[in-house]
Amino acid sequence: MAVNLQIPSESEILPVAGVEIGVAEAGIRKAGRRDLTVFRLAPGSAVAGVFTRNRFRAAPVQVCEAHLAQGGPIRALVVNTGNANAGTGAPGLKNAQDTCAALGKLLDVPAEQILPFSTGVILEPLPMDRLTAGLPAAVADLRADGWYGAAHGIMTTDTLPKIHSRRVDIGGKTVTITGISKGAGMIRPNMATMLGFLATDAGIAQPLLRQLAIELADVSFNRITVDGDTSTNDSFILIATGQAGVTVDSAGDAAYAALRDALAAAATDLAQKIVRDAEGATKFMTIRVEEAGNTEEALKVAYAVAHSPLVKTAFFASDPNLGRILAAIGYAGIDDLDVSRLRLWLGDVLVAVDGGRNPDYQEADGQRVMKQAEILVRIALGRGQVADTVYTCDFSHEYVTINADYRS
């Protein structure tokens, strides 16, 4: 039921020099499904990550953060689906560490140079026997063109793989950017289960890469929401292999802006693909708040509207009960909001002006917009010059069915 989700063909996915990927069936999620993915990175690759702010952080998130904090090289990633290894306490932490150790032996790299990722059911022990038994097959499958298989291998309730690939000219040289993401529910990243892996063959200095990962997550994965739930496992990883002959050492370098913009476009596309494939989604909604006093209040309003079950179900039904949007704006937490200055558009239709119904608004016009698969909700607060945008979807009967049946 994905909403206008465009998936490139396997032949359109560009390998990133310095990245090899292998996928295997380990039987962690269900029999006959690829559920274990390994990335091997060339020596000299730089890696940075942004992780969930949920206080109930999954074991692999804790291990990733610890390994990155050591400041050494990262040579491999390992991702399992079907089990989140979250809410598993000390045994879960040991399982994440043991996963790194097992892969390290196969690749002949130290365990602390490996980052583990898990996605799936929370509060269940990771089946280490199946995971470790599947690692040799994933390693044997390592190849430069493994992105398409990996996009399938990290899926849980996703209906389609999420992949982005492009080439850009940076400083007269060709740079490749390819990434994958997964997530369909429990999506309100705050740095769904949301995982994102984005790689480039450009070289980026490690301190700059860390800052860039934060900035990219903030304009992409931190601007989407499906159901308002922030996962225990949200992770976004940015990889720069340095194989393209282009190196950026500081934000002042001439090549930086073009590289940053290309990476931001890729990250935004991967994030929006998650919303387009959200559990049961039939509508893709852009909530844009303008004339805010600052970014914080713009996002407060945008998320209040995007998270409202009443708003989301109204969009599913194509029911222009748009007072629900005004109500959400009102409880967004801006105490000194002057509603008499507020304006609201649904697509190109002005619904509310000066805090009340536009005298020229006709419900048939609102319904015409709400029947569309992609809808823009634009809100002007009349408080300043700041604008920001959040992407979300509707709530359908299928969303309830998927989550009610998730463990069946």
Curated annotation (Swiss-Prot):
Marked site positions, Cleavage: 192-193
Active site: 193 (nucleophile)
SUPFAM superfamilies named among the record's database cross-references: DmpA/ArgJ-like
Residue(s) at site: Involved in the stabilization of negative charge on the oxyanion by the formation of the oxyanion hole: 119-120
GO CC annotation: cytoplasm
Function of the protein: Catalyzes two activities which are involved in the cyclic version of arginine biosynthesis: the synthesis of N-acetylglutamate from glutamate and acetyl-CoA as the acetyl donor, and of ornithine by transacetylation between N(2)-acetylornithine and glutamate.
Primary localization: cytoplasm
Name listed for the protein in its UniProt record: Arginine biosynthesis bifunctional protein ArgJ
Domain of life: Bacteria
Transmembrane segments: none
UniProt-annotated binding residues for substrate: 156, 182, 193, 279, 403, 408
Alphabetized InterPro entries for the sequence: Arg_biosynth_ArgJ, ArgJ-like_dom_sf, ArgJ_beta_C
Compartments in which it is found: Cytoplasm
Gene expressing this chain: argJ
Enzyme Commission code: 2.3.1.35, 2.3.1.1
Family per similarity comment: Belongs to the ArgJ family.
Keywords: Acyltransferase, Amino-acid biosynthesis, Arginine biosynthesis, Autocatalytic cleavage, Cytoplasm, Multifunctional enzyme, Transferase
Any one GO MF annotation of this record: L-glutamate N-acetyltransferase activity
Reaction catalyzed: N(2)-acetyl-L-ornithine + L-glutamate = N-acetyl-L-glutamate + L-ornithine; L-glutamate + acetyl-CoA = N-acetyl-L-glutamate + CoA + H(+)
Assembly information from the UniProt record: Heterotetramer of two alpha and two beta chains.
